[in-house]
């Protein structure tokens, strides 16, 4: 057996060790470490080298406007947390394959309906090809529609238009996806739109064609049918004749969908990972949950008791939480490099070749504090651990 590949992998794992801070800690040690980290975070975020000196006289009652500002900030943060999309699952860890699926470029037969118009252009894709390239819906991680805005002529440089992207349905209806202002410049520019949800629908449905429409924004007061002509030129829609058409097809950069998907051979790992819930507070703090692996661990920090601080008026403390637990479901017993990892750990017992349990979602913390007799309201970023991941 040639030892070269094995040695190369061991060297790579040695480099990875230098980037890892993952260490085994008992629960009490982890709590103490988190409390000290919070102490340093708060002081550094407020640009303080030490806690403000305590006032000799008790602080006056909070002004109504300060209390109102603090309460409204808390409500806004709660609303944002409710609307926040769920964190990425464990499959975020794995490398993704990139698949390039160009749009259809013939305008005859059933495609004749999708010829470019003065104010709109259409991107038509063979959904059967998308399914063959990507595989199942569960394997798709992200999809982007990419197109090249061609450089503008000297007399139209600086032109700016509001363009809107829509997804087409079989019943001739359209769903708005994205809008953006695009400026024509003297250089080519790649434009990209997130179409992950649309491609997910293609992979789940039975449609033969998937269609996107890019249109010039039509102000409401003008009414439908009165949109400006599209002055932004997208490569791939030029109409050539005769021999020039075949030559142009070879060299033009047509719009395409870039699909990022897990390889099909990793479907078993994906299926196993998706059986796990998101490692957030809803799951980790749920009734009956006794998760031994990576999860959010509860930790309430009392500013007076744990930090010996009296200068923070509100809140009196907060749920800081922390991440803790092994990550066995990524480096499992059936992983192909298990033997190599075991050999590496044998020679490097203090190393951690496996991923670490680290924060994935963090929320801010609003506080009211005094500097002398002056009251201030501040929002401290990334203070509350809401979800963890293995990385």
From Swiss-Prot:
SMART domains with a match to the protein in the record: TGFB
Gene3D superfamilies for the chain: 2.60.120.970, Cystine-knot cytokines
Gene Ontology CC: extracellular space
Segments passing through the bilayer: none
Top-level taxon in the UniProt lineage: Eukaryota
Record has Disulfide bond as a keyword: yes
Cleaved signal peptide residues: 1-18
Region annotated Arm domain, chain positions: 64-270
Residue ranges, annotated region (Straightjacket domain): 19-63
Function: Transforming growth factor beta-1 proprotein: Precursor of the Latency-associated peptide (LAP) and Transforming growth factor beta-1 (TGF-beta-1) chains, which constitute the regulatory and active subunit of TGF-beta-1, respectively.
Subunit structure: Latency-associated peptide: Homodimer; disulfide-linked. Latency-associated peptide: Interacts with Transforming growth factor beta-1 (TGF-beta-1) chain; interaction is non-covalent and maintains (TGF-beta-1) in a latent state; each Latency-associated peptide (LAP) monomer interacts with TGF-beta-1 in the other monomer. Transforming growth factor beta-1: Homodimer; disulfide-linked. Transforming growth factor beta-1: Interacts with TGF-beta receptors (TGFBR1 and TGFBR2), leading to signal transduction.
Protein name per the record: Transforming growth factor beta-1 proprotein
Gene: TGFB1
């Amino acid at each position: 057996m040639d030892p070269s590949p094995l040695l190369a992998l061991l060297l790579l794992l040695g480099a990875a060790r230098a980037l890892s801070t993952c260490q085994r800690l008992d629960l009490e040690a982890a709590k103490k470490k988190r409390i000290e980290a919070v102490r340093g975070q708060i002081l550094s975020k407020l640009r303080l080298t030490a806690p403000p000196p305590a006032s000799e006289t008790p602080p006056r009652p909070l002004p109504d406007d300060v209390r109102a500002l603090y309460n409204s900030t808390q409500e806004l943060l709660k609303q944002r947390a409710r609307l926040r999309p769920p964190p990425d699952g464990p499959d975020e860890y794995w490398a993704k394959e990139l698949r390039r699926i160009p749009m259809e470029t013939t305008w005859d037969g059933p495609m004749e309906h999708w010829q470019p118009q003065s104010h709109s252009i259409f991107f038509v894709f063979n959904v059967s090809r998308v399914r063959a390239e990507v595989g199942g819906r569960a394997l798709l991680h992200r999809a982007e529609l990419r197109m090249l805005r061609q450089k503008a002529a000297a007399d139209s440089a600086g032109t700016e238009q509001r363009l809107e992207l829509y997804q087409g349905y079989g019943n001739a209806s359209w769903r708005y996806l994205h809008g953006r202002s695009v400026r024509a410049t003297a250089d080519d520019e790649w434009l990209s739109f997130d179409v992950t949800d649309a491609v997910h629908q293609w992979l789940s449905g039975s449609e033969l064609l998937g269609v996107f429409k890019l249109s010039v924004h039509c102000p409401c007061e003008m009414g439908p049918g009165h949109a400006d002509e599209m002055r932004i030129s997208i490569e791939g829609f030029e109409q050539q004749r005769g021999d020039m058409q075949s030559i142009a097809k070879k060299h033009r950069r047509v719009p395409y969908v870039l699909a990022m998907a897990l390889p099909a051979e990793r479907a078993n790992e994906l299926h196993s990972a998706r059986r796990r819930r998101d490692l957030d507070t809803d799951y980790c703090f749920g009734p009956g949950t006794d998760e031994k692996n990576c999860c959010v661990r509860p930790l309430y920090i009392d500013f007076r008791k744990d930090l010996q601080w009296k200068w923070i008026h509100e809140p009196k403390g907060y749920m800081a939480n922390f991440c803790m637990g092994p990550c066995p479901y990524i480096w499992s017993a059936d992983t192909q490099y298990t033997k190599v990892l075991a050999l590496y750990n044998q020679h490097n017992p203090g190393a951690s070749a496996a991923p670490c349990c680290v924060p994935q979602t963090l929320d801010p913390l609003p506080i009211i504090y005094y500097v002398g007799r002056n009251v201030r309201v501040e929002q401290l970023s990334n203070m509350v651990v809401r979800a963890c991941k293995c990385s």
